[in-house]
Amino acid sequence: MFRHSSRLLARATTMGWRRPFSTDLPAETAADSTFVEAWKKLIPNVDPPKTPSAYMAPRPATPSSIPSKLTVNFVLPYSSELAGKEVDMVIIPATTGQMGVLPGHVATIAELKPGVMSVHEGNDVSKYFVSGGFAFIHANSFADIIAVEAVPLDRIDANLVQKGLAEFTQKLNTASTDVEKAEAQIGVDVHSALNAALTG
């Protein structure tokens, strides 16, 4: 198989055709024109339907330069913590791990898990504990972060966190139904993340 690869590669590079990527738009709609001609031969009195390629729009041009700042909107169900704030970087606790977002980041949707979100602006770092939510990172250097609950890290009482962790651990150990176990597990997960945020 490998001994033929150089010959196949040479043949592929010298041929005049190019296989487009799945996201590329076709240079010409040859398949559409063939379809329209066949349609008009069979049913000349009815306009041909539009094919999927008729609805495709060209991709917007990629900006030539990356903005120097990331614009962040950080929203809770009951308030807006940050609205149009220009920052250098945001680190979010995604379910896939800690995710740093800089200006020019690729468009992404990330689910948030309980953890610390840090907002970096120059030498200042603001830290929030988020219980969960979603982050929508747009290609134009905007980030919309929606959290179920968020508290500035400096407003969290470490003693209450320890007390809550012990309480939910006890509930988890004594839970008898699946619902009780699930509720206790959520409490343990959130308080463990709070404890880790305060101690580390």
UniProtKB/Swiss-Prot annotation:
Q: Tell me one GO molecular function of this protein.
A: proton-transporting ATP synthase activity, rotational mechanism
Where mainly located?
Answer: mitochondrion
Q: Pfam families in the record, alphabetically?
A: ATP-synt_DE_N
The answer to whether the entry has keyword Acetylation is no
Iron recorded as keyword: no
Q: Where in the cell is it found?
A: Mitochondrion; Mitochondrion inner membrane
Which cellular component appears as one GO term in the record?
proton-transporting ATP synthase complex
**Which UniProt keywords are present, listed alphabetically?**
ATP synthesis, CF(1), Hydrogen ion transport, Ion transport, Membrane, Mitochondrion, Mitochondrion inner membrane, Transit peptide, Transport
Q: Tell me where on the tree of life, at the top rank, the source sits.
A: Eukaryota
Residue range of the transit peptide in the UniProt record, numbered on this chain: 1-21
Stored InterPro entries: ATP_synth_F1_dsu/esu, ATP_synth_F1_dsu/esu_N, ATPsynth_dsu/esu_N
What is this protein's function? Mitochondrial membrane ATP synthase (F(1)F(0) ATP synthase or Complex V) produces ATP from ADP in the presence of a proton gradient across the membrane which is generated by electron transport complexes of the respiratory chain. F-type ATPases consist of two structural domains, F(1) - containing the extramembraneous catalytic core, and F(0) - containing the membrane proton channel, linked together by a central stalk and a peripheral stalk. During catalysis, ATP turnover in the catalytic domain of F(1) is coupled via a rotary mechanism of the central stalk subunits to proton translocation.
Family named by the database record: Belongs to the ATPase epsilon chain family.
* Subunit organization: F-type ATPases have 2 components, CF(1) - the catalytic core - and CF(0) - the membrane proton channel. CF(1) has five subunits: alpha(3), beta(3), gamma(1), delta(1), epsilon(1). CF(0) has three main subunits: a, b and c.
Q: What is this protein called?
A: ATP synthase subunit delta', mitochondrial
